[in-house]
């Protein structure tokens, strides 16, 4: 027997990194939102690494912030260390990474959800969806509560039929020994969704005061104040270091001699693990020529002794983990507080989704995060904000939002998932983005703040500050383009001191800045502005001027892509009626059901000849006799 428990615009299942962004995005747009989670003490919990950001991922956090999301603001308030990565490389691959106080991060994010006026936070286990006439109309919990909604977002993480594996021990569990979600997974199969089995792992945690830090290398944070959020004005200066050590030949020997006890090699683990975050067993076997592997010791917070042993992800038995740790410099006498483990879980095949993250099978049902086959908090949060935006907008009768591959890394991530699918936990990399010079850490606001403001997630006050910054960038570029730097003796001497060749004639400030030895700071010593320019404006001017040619080339490629994106494919096109398309391409097109010719061209197995035939049919207006 069930009972009617309430009516909402949007219900979010799960309150991990995808769930909190989905819920806040929905509620802040004006949709009455309910969040149901198995354990209220686990809101925004970090079951694996206590960090946010890194290559590509850090840019996603900036994009979430530019859209009006919460992850950037939250980590700025709760980090213990922050570093800019790849500073010696070009701006396209620079990214911020923060070590989190994982407990403070959780507390702060839960507090944010509790204070959100349009949002209700509730502990409960969802076991079934209410589906009527192919539409999701709500959820049913373990206690029989029926919650009705116009849209539902599933952000179930690694809880779906979760199973923890540690040596020869295996038991049903969510991450960190939380209760798993069994019946919801079975229900998804009943509804006809294709599920896959993935696996991830985590390393042991050790006690800080049993580490001999004198045998490790200190890894401090940056001295320069850093922030993910464009709104952050107060910076944490009291940072904690991380520490670097290495495995030893003895470590590898212990692993090799115990591979028969590893669930990965005994066949006990059936799920596919992440390629770019392998276990230590995998690293030792696959890279057996390497005498050692890096191990980073990362504090899990300011008020805990627990230290995360980054690089030692494992599911080997506890006794083997203890022996492994004792062979690592600095950890000879370490106390293991928690053993590492592997966790298997169900995910849906993501080609069953539209680019809005709504499922094709059931309307008004959205999915985001690890349920879609991704790995990583940032990838989850990026999907979460988009699913929350679109579920909220659909519930309110508004047009949904799709970010393209040239708009954001979030657009690349979602397009890869829904177009190509994934046969392993998907991790976002800079190499996955063909327009990465346009998708930089520094310009996320210029790319996405207008969208965030239009949909109601960016305040008018913040938008006015953004418009002021944009105007300042253009004004300074215009000034530097018009100013002529003359070949005076003083100027020539200064340029020579920087290792540059002398000026033959007067040169525009923008042209001088394009020289490799020059930057905004050096050029403005020769042609200073009347009023000092803010650092973020100066950085943007320098990048836009220095890389103008490359940026222009990328923008031309984007324009070509937009023409293909604008060639829409009707949803109910009958690919079987199009003669000449290869069998594999026909099957893939029917499965993915791309919305545009550009998306169709990105499907693996669909070649240019197939696209040409498809274009002919579309241009003739025949549309291959759309199937009824």
Swiss-Prot record:
Biological process, per Gene Ontology: tRNA methylation; tRNA wobble uridine modification
Binding site for FAD: 14-19, 126, 181, 370
Pfam families the record matches: GIDA, GIDA_C_1st, SAM_GIDA_C
SUPFAM superfamilies: FAD/NAD(P)-binding domain
Keywords: Cytoplasm, FAD, Flavoprotein, NAD, tRNA processing
Binding site for NAD(+): 273-287
Cofactor(s) for this UniProt protein: FAD
One annotated Gene Ontology cellular component of this protein: cytosol
Main location: cytoplasm
An example Gene Ontology molecular-function term: flavin adenine dinucleotide binding
Keyword Cytoplasm: yes
Subcellular location: Cytoplasm
Gene3D superfamilies listed in its UniProt record: FAD/NAD(P)-binding domain, GidA associated domain, C-terminal subdomain, tRNA uridine 5-carboxymethylaminomethyl modification enzyme MnmG/GidA
PROSITE patterns hit by this protein: GIDA_1, GIDA_2
Quaternary state and interactors: Homodimer. Heterotetramer of two MnmE and two MnmG subunits.
Function: NAD-binding protein involved in the addition of a carboxymethylaminomethyl (cmnm) group at the wobble position (U34) of certain tRNAs, forming tRNA-cmnm(5)s(2)U34.
Family: Belongs to the MnmG family.
This protein's name: tRNA uridine 5-carboxymethylaminomethyl modification enzyme MnmG
The species this protein was found in: Bacillus subtilis (strain 168)
Lineage of the organism: Bacteria, Bacillati, Bacillota, Bacilli, Bacillales
């Amino acid at each position: 027997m069930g009972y009617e428990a309430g009516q909402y615009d949007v219900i979010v299942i799960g309150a991990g990194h995808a769930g909190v962004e989905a819920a806040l995005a929905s509620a802040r747009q004006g949709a009455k939102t309910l969040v149901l989670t198995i354990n209220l003490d686990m809101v925004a919990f970090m079951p694996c690494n206590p960090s946010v950001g890194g290559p590509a991922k850090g840019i996603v956090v900036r994009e979430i912030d530019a859209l009006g999301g919460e992850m950037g603001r939250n980590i700025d308030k709760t980090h213990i260390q922050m570093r800019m990565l790849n500073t010696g490389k070009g701006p396209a691959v620079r990214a911020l990474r923060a070590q989190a106080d994982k407990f403070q991060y959780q507390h702060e994010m839960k507090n944010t959800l509790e204070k959100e006026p349009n949002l209700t936070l509730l502990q409960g286990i969802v076991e079934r969806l209410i589906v009527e006439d192919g539409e999701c109309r709500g959820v049913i919990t373990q206690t029989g509560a029926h919650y009705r909604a116009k849209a539902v977002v599933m952000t179930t993480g690694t809880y779906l039929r979760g199973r923890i594996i540690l040596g020869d021990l295996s038991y049903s569990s969510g991450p960190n020994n939380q209760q798993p979600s069994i019946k919801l997974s079975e229900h998804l199969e009943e509804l006809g969704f294709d599920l896959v089995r993935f696996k991830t792992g985590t390393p042991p945690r050790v006690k800080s005061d049993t580490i001999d830090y004198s045998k490790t290398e200190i890894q401090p944070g940056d001295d320069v104040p850093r922030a993910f959020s464009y709104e952050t004005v107060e910076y944490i200066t009291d940072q904690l270091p991380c520490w670097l050590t290495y495995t030893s030949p003895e470590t590898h020997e212990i692993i090799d001699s115990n591979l028969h006890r590893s669930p990965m090699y005994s066949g006990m683990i059936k799920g596919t693990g992440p390629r770019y975050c392998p276990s230590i067993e995998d690293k030792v076997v696959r890279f057996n020529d390497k005498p050692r592997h890096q191990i980073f010791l990362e504090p899990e917070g300011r008020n805990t002794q627990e230290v995360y042993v980054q690089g030692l992800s494992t599911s080997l038995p506890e006794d083997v983990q203890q022996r492994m740790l004792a062979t690592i410099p600095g950890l000879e006498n370490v106390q293991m507080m928690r053993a590492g483990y592997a966790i298997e879980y169900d995910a849906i095949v993501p080609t069953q989704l539209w680019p809005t993250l709504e499922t094709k099978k059931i309307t008004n049902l959205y999915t985001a995060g690890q349920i879609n086959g991704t790995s990583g908090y940032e990838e989850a949060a990026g999907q979460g904000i988009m699913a929350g935006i679109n579920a909220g907008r659909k519930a309110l009768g508004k047009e949904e939002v799709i970010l393209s591959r040239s708009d954001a890394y979030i657009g690349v991530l979602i397009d890869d998932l829904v177009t190509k699918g994934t046969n392993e936990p998907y991790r976002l990399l800079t190499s996955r983005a063909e327009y990465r010079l346009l998708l930089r850490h520094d310009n996320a606001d210029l790319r996405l703040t207008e969208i965030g403001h239009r949909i109601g997630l960016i305040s008018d006050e913040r938008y006015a500050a953004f418009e002021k910054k944009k105007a300042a960038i253009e004004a300074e570029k215009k000034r530097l383009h018009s100013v002529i730097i003359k070949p005076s003796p003083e100027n020539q001497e200064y340029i020579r001191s920087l290792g540059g060749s002398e000026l033959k004639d007067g040169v525009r400030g923008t042209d001088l800045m394009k020289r490799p030895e020059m930057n905004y700071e050096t050029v403005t010593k020769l042609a200073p502005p009347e009023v000092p320019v803010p650092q973020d404006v100066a950085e943007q001017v320098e990048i836009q001027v220095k890389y103008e040619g490359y940026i222009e080339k990328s923008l031309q490629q984007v324009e070509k892509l937009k023409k293909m994106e604008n060639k829409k494919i009707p949803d109910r096109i009958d690919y079987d009626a199009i003669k000449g398309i290869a069998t594999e391409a026909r099957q893939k097109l029917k499965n993915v059901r791309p919305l545009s010719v550009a998306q169709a061209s990105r499907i693996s197995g669909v070649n240019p000849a197939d696209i040409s035939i498809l274009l002919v049919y579309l241009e003739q207006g025949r549309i291959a006799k759309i199937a009824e």
